[in-house]
């Protein structure tokens, strides 16, 4: 992690692949992080921030494809709290990345992933790729990101690059080019 940081690269920890092969890991993790103390505060927000800072990690990456637990109010509140703690402790590079089955960020989905304003971020988002290609909704997703956060920083379009025959000109318009790109490698062949 130290070498990555010296070279300007963030390191994401706790990468969880919540797919059908894990036997319900997404639901177990969601239950774990939503545990509250007797005073109503989340039990594991401070320990997670402390652990990541100690180990030199900048954030958490989630693959929530097999569940919709990320839409639960407690999950939203938990992740907002992580951002608030990180900010209060000067952990300014802290990030949470969500990857779901969604290939667009909308006014509806930004309520449970992304956030509604700069002071209440829930996560950053990697849009799911469409048919092994860029999301067709990059432009509208950028518009929603900018409406809520003032910028599209933290919004990424996934593209599956195994065949390399993607619509590489897709981000070539003034709106879509403000979306980051996440190149997605092989996992099926």
Positions of predicted regions on the chain:
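Extended aliphatic helical segments
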Residues: 76, 125, 142, 159-162, ...
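Mature extracellular/periplasmic domains of secretome proteins
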Residues: 113-120, 141-148, 172-174
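Glycine-enriched alpha-helix->loop->beta-strand junction motifs that scaffold or abut catalytic
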Residues: 119-123, 151-153, 176-180
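Chitinase-like catalytic core of GlcNAc-active glycosidases
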Residues: 1-137
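Substrate-binding cleft of secreted/luminal carbohydrate-active enzymes
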Residues: 155-189
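Glycoside hydrolase catalytic-domain groove-lining segments
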Residues: 134-160, 167
């Amino acid at each position: 992690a130290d070498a990555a940081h010296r070279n300007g690269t963030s390191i994401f920890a706790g990468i969880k692949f919540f797919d059908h092969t894990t036997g319900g890991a997404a639901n177990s993790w969601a239950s774990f992080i939503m545990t509250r103390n007797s005073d109503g505060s989340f039990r594991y927000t401070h320990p997670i921030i402390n652990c990541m800072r100690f180990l030199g990690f900048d954030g958490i990456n989630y693959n929530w494809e097999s569940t919709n637990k990320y839409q639960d109010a407690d999950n939203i509140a938990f992740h907002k709290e992580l951002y608030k703690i990180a900010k209060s402790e000067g952990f300014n590079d802290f990030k949470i990345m969500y990857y779901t089955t969604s290939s667009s960020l909308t006014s509806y989905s930004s309520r449970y992933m992304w956030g509604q304003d700069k002071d209440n971020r829930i996560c950053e988002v990697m849009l799911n790729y469409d048919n092994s290609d860029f999301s067709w909704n990059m432009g509208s997703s950028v518009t929603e990101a900018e409406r809520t956060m003032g910028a599209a920083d933290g919004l990424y379009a996934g593209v599956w690059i195994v065949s390399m025959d993607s619509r590489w000109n897709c981000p070539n318009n003034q709106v879509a080019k403000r979306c980051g790109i996440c190149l997605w490698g092989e996992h099926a062949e």
